Amino acid sequence: MRVLGIETSCDETGIAIYDDQQGLLANQLYSQVKLHADYGGVVPELASRDHVRKTVPLIQAALKEAGLTAKDIDAVAYTAGPGLVGALLVGATVGRALAFAWNVPAIPVHHMEGHLLAPMLEDNPPAFPFVALLVSGGHTQLISVTGIGQYELLGESIDDAAGEAFDKTAKLLGLDYPGGPMLSKMASQGTEGRFVFPRPMTDRPGLDFSFSGLKTFAANTIRSNGDDEQTRADIARAFEDAVVDTLMIKCRRALEQTGFKRLVMAGGVSANRTLRAKLAEMMQKRGGEVFYARPEFCTDNGAMIAYAGMVRLQTGAKAELGVTVRPRWPLAELPAA
């Protein structure tokens, strides 16, 4: 079975083809970072228009990369939510139209389920059950995963997502959009312990997160200590350490609560090297395992959508006749396979 995956939920146009026997056959990705850089963030209207321009040419490029034609595709999977409504509609409309023209099923995919399953694209995929840390610009969630569609929300951010906090703090430090990866690079030059940021909501029971206060703490620290290059690097280090420690503490609690031995980390922030190292160290001490996708599959991409669509189709998902997207879509509402 060969599935064409279409991802257009935000500011990346991702197209991929996944074969259940041969694995990933093609992976095309276009990022709109330069388009939105002058605005300091994603402009929804510009994102939608750029998806319109790029989606079909990238599909053609993916077919060429895989050495396939339209008649070789058995299904089309597209991101149906959550995300920006206009951007989602571009991918959903193209996906549904192609499926109709090619007479194959059109499978709507939950964007965060795509991220959650992305580590299964690797050679050593995780087995169920596991705790999943979904950490990105729009989401920070801990999920108990016992099977496809068997997702229980354990905790989530009550305000900013971790990735959003990274980007906002990076802006305070004078870094360009998207600031998260640049902040991490700056943090690597920082002095450990010069500044100490709080670890929000770790002094009380529960698995929820709160990251908005760290941005305020960073702003106050910058005002009080100047903005020379080393000071900014030290502040970046303190901020990153606080976020990573908070995520690690909550992951440990989730593992203790569920009794699971496997931790899956997914979403854009899961590419963070410090976070990967800290969680790997923690799981080694616990006698467990941590799983994550390669960096290019941590951020938005078509490969995870093609794979998730294939999994859903193989477990009995029905093709959608209409074009429906859901900008807000709780993961727990997905049906169990």
Swiss-Prot record:
A GO CC term assigned to this protein in UniProt: cytoplasm
InterPro entries on file: ATPase_NBD, Gcp-like_dom, KAE1/TsaD, Peptidase_M22_CS, TsaD
EC number(s) recorded for this UniProt protein: 2.3.1.234
Catalyzed reactions: L-threonylcarbamoyladenylate + adenosine(37) in tRNA = N(6)-L-threonylcarbamoyladenosine(37) in tRNA + AMP + H(+)
UniProt entry keywords in alphabetical sequence: Acyltransferase, Cytoplasm, Iron, Metal-binding, Transferase, tRNA processing
Listed Gene3D superfamilies: 3.30.420.40
Residues binding substrate, per UniProt: 134-138, 167, 180, 272
Cofactor note: Binds 1 Fe(2+) ion per subunit.
One Pfam family linked to the record: TsaD
Cofactor: Fe(2+)
Superkingdom: Bacteria
Subcellular localization(s) per the UniProt record: Cytoplasm
Signal peptide as annotated in the record: none
Gene Ontology biological process terms from the UniProt entry: tRNA threonylcarbamoyladenosine modification
CDD domains, sorted: ASKHA_NBD_TsaD_bac (cd24133)
Residues binding Fe cation: 111, 115, 300
Annotated GO MF terms: iron ion binding; N(6)-L-threonylcarbamoyladenine synthase activity
Family: Belongs to the KAE1 / TsaD family.
Its biological purpose: Required for the formation of a threonylcarbamoyl group on adenosine at position 37 (t(6)A37) in tRNAs that read codons beginning with adenine. Is involved in the transfer of the threonylcarbamoyl moiety of threonylcarbamoyl-AMP (TC-AMP) to the N6 group of A37, together with TsaE and TsaB. TsaD likely plays a direct catalytic role in this reaction.
Protein known as: tRNA N6-adenosine threonylcarbamoyltransferase
Underlying gene: tsaD
